Amino acid sequence: MQVPSIRVVFLLTAVFCVGVKSDECKTADVVVNVDASDDVSDQDFDKLKRAMLMMVRGLSIDDNQIRLGMVTYGSEVCDSIPLQGDRLDLARTIRYMKKPTGPSKPFKGMGEARRMFSSRGRYNVPHITMNLGGDIVDTEVKDLMDETDKARDEDIKVMAIGLGAKVDRDEIESIAYDRDQAYFMDDEDDLIRKVKEIPDYLCKIIKAKKPKVSGGKKSKPAKKVDNGPAGKSPGFDALKQSDDKSDKAKKVEVKELCDDAEWVDGVGYGSVPTRCEDFVMCQNVSGSLRKTLKSCPFGQYWSKRQTSCVLTEDEDCSDDLCKTMLLPSREYDVSCRAYWKCEKGKSVARCCPSGMAYEPGKGCVLDLDCDEECPPKNDGDDDDDSSDEDDDDEIEYNPNCPLRPIKGHPEKFKQHTGDDNWEDFDCAPGTLFSARDCACSILGTAKKDDKNDDGGDAHKVCEPELYLPFCDDLHDYSGKETHVENEGDAVIIENGKAYFNGRAGLKIPRFSGVPYGKSVFIKMKYKEDEDDDKNKNDDDKKLRMKRDERSRKDYLKAILKRDDRKDKTDDTKGRRIIDRNDIIDDRRGRRKDDRKDGGRDDGKDGRRDDRKDNRLDDIKDKNDEPMTLISNGECDNFELNDCFEKPSIAITTGKKSAGFSVTSSEKDEVDLEIDEDKKGYLWDKEDGPDRNGKDKDRNGDRSDDRRGYYWKKKDKDDNGKDKDKKGDKSDDKKGYYWKKDKDDKNGKDKDKRRDKSDDKKSLDDIVREIERSKGNGKDDNKDDEDDDKKGWKTVSLKISNGHIRGRRDDREDKDVLDGDLKTTFSGFQIGQGASNKNFKGYMDEVYIYFCDPGKEADYDDEDDDDDDDDSDENDKNDDKKDGKKTDDKDKKDRKDGRDDRKDGRDDRKDRRDDRKDDRKGGKDDRKDDRKGGKDDRKDGRDVRDDRDRGDKYDKKDDKDNDRLSDKDDRKDVDDNDKDDDNEKLYKRAMKKCDYVNKNVAKWLDKR
């Protein structure tokens, strides 16, 4: 059972104000061993993880201060976190650590901690192991003591914390570096309460000088071996020192390696702990044991089973750091260009291109001083090479690969297209070509020197790294074929738009660990979904709310129409009294009668309504929380509201605001905010203020808020007196009178005030309204487009050479950033991240540039203008050709017209003769009709009597049929309207996607 996350947040807030006070105690490498065997319940294991999270928050975790690692063990080591200084990464990994199984084997946890210090520990930095567990089984005490003694010899200080009332105090004290470094706690809850004291415990053991007696023997820390620059691991390099330096710890270590060696023909071969790529050779020379450390060839591991070096993919080394390492790559110390890349949990050797070096956390970067060979050549492997210029190509050339590298351009490769033809291709941004893999599998970005530029880049077009118009599912239209993940197809793509339901998002893993450069531009078009989740699935509640609102409005209208009631207002109770008996409660819209009330407590109802209003305000505030549009960090948006990897880019949106958060590589954080209520108002300043400092409208009249009336100064007659305006409401305020403005076509009062424009309208909307007012008639297609544009917003973030600009529609905010944008390893995430609510709504387009596009438009209108110009010229040429044909046709038409007019005169003469004959025959017909009419009227009376009798019986059936037919008609109308809406959406989507396809094709052709 997991502990509620909210309690964790409160505990963290209370604890993390302590910290480490002394500067001497702020630098150390700490590994925590946690006993999570079958003796520990799932609930207690969750409490241990809570304590670890609290400790991560309380310590000064940083790459230059305290680095923390963690090991959980049962019968075997389960999960381990390498030493690192990333607080967010540690918190994320701790929360998702799994509980191991089996009986407790604490010596295995201690051994894993020793290997971690040997491979990743810093030089001249205190190494601390915190052993956290319960009672130790007697059979495991000896093995644990042996590992503890080895840790002391390697100058690792052990802090022991015993949990539970059954722990043996003597055993815990014997494990500790000295008795003062042993602590006892009742249970996991007691550990949580005392976790704030752990920084003091660490400071105490860091300052400890001399170890005391442990296990009946004195154990002195081994002397450190100077192995070169700071930051290198002393574990393996200490074994490489010459035999002249007879260090006791070195001899013990090498002796242990030879004890476990496999002997073949008088030579022993043994593996080296934590170094899968190394082995030791043991030989008996003149009665003494000679030890020689060897390294496997590039990209190979030592296989104890085969007693030889094999490819890393063929050997399952238990000490392979890729089994527990979170980063995708790490340093390989055989060359400045070499590094290990994690693939499917195994390490694979890779080389950076020439002129580049591997830098941990960044990948391959430009380094002209790195001129080492990669793979390095072993002794005796020197063959006759053709020339120095071809060395790099020969090293990275794979004869079984149809692709070849291009010298000086690691971001490109050649592909054989038939015969003797080779064509150049570009790798995906952020990757470099590897001949060994026959693919663009190297993480990094190639950078060219200014000296080698041939001037071609001056006219290079800034191309998007990602362009998602959502026309063909999640197809990237930038030409880079970027893969976009849609887990579970939770994001719905339809009609050229993507719908996010508030619990889904898109992920772009390609941008993980890729340097962004000095310029980044992101642009998105979106529309928020205004439906409330709680009311969306509660149709009955919606119907009740609508019904009550309609009843309240109708009742108030009926009351206002009654002139026999006198309105009174009681300001103290917030009620409007209609007469002596009736009371209207404005909040509920219901009429109350004092005589039937029976002593109703209006104050109590008012308080109840206030509480209801507060709840509604809380729901409204919750709905106004910012939602994430895009980020490049991995965050938890539902539990602790914390980021495991803090994003360096985050764009959020609210109903009236937009936020932009940017973090540089220099740890400079900049936050921009665009708030419609505070920034970016559009004021109409054409009419200045009047003498009283108030804004005048267009006509110079003083506006007022009284139901469409406005103040207008009275006109003067010839004698200087005010004219009487019929129908105007006079007023005795200095020659001004009230005048009601004429209603518009919709029955609404026109607004005469122009002091400032509506802050919800953008400048583009105002311009479009003015243009529509100048046009004649209405354009249905244009109205459809305007309806489709309602609610859509455009947000963009531009970072260029240290300058930041965030914009939403026509409002923007600017600032300055120190350094380049920080690289993250979470990729880009659309619709989620940054510890905010997931986005709920629609997205129309998404652009990501790693350059400065200059203009914010994705594809300029220049292409369309060119097409229009070409079409105009073609139309002119066609008109000239058609002109000659038109003249000949006109002559023929005039001749035919004369013949037609002659025939028309003959036709009119024939029609006059026909009318004469018709009048003569009409007289005879009327006589016959009068005679037959008498008989028909008699028969008609009989028919009416029968029909009346039948209508009495059929009236009920007709009403039922009418109701059914009306219901069917309404259903058909609704279905037709729905089909029309879907057809409109489909047409708009096709129009948009046709435009996108046409312009993208032109852009790719130009590129």
UniProtKB/Swiss-Prot annotation:
Q: How does it assemble?
A: Heterooligomer; disulfide-linked. Pif97, Pif80, N16 and other proteins form a complex.
Q: What is the lineage of its organism?
A: Eukaryota, Metazoa, Spiralia, Lophotrochozoa, Mollusca
Its recorded name reads Protein PIF
Query: Taking every annotated instance into account, which residue ranges of this chain make up the domain VWFA?
Result: 29-202
**In which residue ranges is the amino acid composition biased (Acidic residues)?**
380-396, 858-876
- GO MF terms, alphabetically ordered: chitin binding
Role summary: Essential component of the organic matrix for normal growth of the nacreous layer. The complex contributes to the initiation of aragonite crystallization as well as subsequent stacking of aragonite tablets in the nacreous layer. Pif80 binds to both aragonite and calcite crystals, with a higher specificity to aragonite crystals.
The residue ranges crossing the membrane are none
Q: Where is the composition biased (Basic residues)?
A: 212-222
Q: What else is known?
A: Pif80 and Pif97 are rich in Asp. This amino-acid appears to be common to biomineral-forming organisms.
InterPro entries per UniProt: Chitin-bd_dom (IPR002557), Chitin-bd_dom_sf (IPR036508), ECM_Assembly_Org (IPR050525), VWF_A (IPR002035), vWFA_dom_sf (IPR036465)
Per UniProt, the ranges with Polar residues bias are: 651-664
